[in-house]
Amino acid sequence: MLKIMRISENQTPERLRGSRSKILRKIGRFGINISGWTIKGKIPDEERIVLIAAPHTSNWDFILAMLAIFGLNIKVRWLGKHSIFKPGFKKFFEWLGGIPVYRDNPSSLIENVVNIVKKEKSIVIAMTPEGTRKKVKRWKTGFLRIAKQTHSKILLISIDAPTKSIEIGKIFNPSGNSEEDLAYIQKYYSTFKGINPQKS
């Protein structure tokens, strides 16, 4: 019987691979394989990447994302709502690569991320531009500012529940006009449906 490989570390260029244990990498690949989801495409071989993932409509997105990060073995830091970094869980989520987002102080967050990126020769910063699982009309533009200040490429990652696939899409080069860039990106993602499509 032909074995279907839905995820492979070879989808990540060497300079963007993490230093996770073989066990964690196997857990990631096993989790994706038994879930029936597939990772399509490859992470581009760029020095610095700001990765945005959408549509974000379910708590399951986080679990799928962590399995994919482990399986692909990406060297990544991700932004998450500060409320999940509670005492007892804070160290765990930071170990997973998490950076808490305090929405009342966005400039401090951007400064923090910029400092993290500057310390690394190569790294991926991941975030969800909607900023919430709820349906929103206008996405946040922090990722555009972070990409500009860190001289990073923007990588579009889509979650498509009907096909059970996470698609590693194309690199987006900002024009400098945040409104036009955001409109283009939101239109790109409009063809994909999240796990809870009514929130897309």
Where are these regions (language model features)?
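Helix-enriched interaction subdomains in cytosolic or periplasmic regions
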Residues: I4-R25
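Soluble catalytic domains of membrane acyltransferases
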Residues: T12, R17, N33-T191, K199-S200
